Amino acid sequence: DQADLFDSQGNPIIYLPPHSTRMIGTGLCFAPPEGWAILGFARSGLATKKGLAPANKACVIDEDYRGQAFVPLHNHSDMSQEIVHGDRIAQFMFVPYYQAQFDVVDELDETERGAGGFGSTGK
């Protein structure tokens, strides 16, 4: 399998009423190494076929978390949906991160772009 992410599966049978959110256990327990986090994302098939996607769009498992990963799964559809054991409910990826350190300053260096955002680069 050439996919970069690994899938998690729902445990027991769970019913999600229309437009509701439930915390779904993945059955996977984590202890991320120092300097690493685990990010969880929607599975495109589950989102397009059943209207189910993580309520918070991206799940984050910090390096100091210990225990089972849960996905707050939201049913965007107008029909009740069923999650059965073996359904792939999210995909996860290990990512290294840098712990930023911040300085309080009175002003920032000027750039040509400045504070322009949301389409200001012309792309």
Predicted regions and their residues:
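DUTPase catalytic domain/fold
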Residues: 1-123
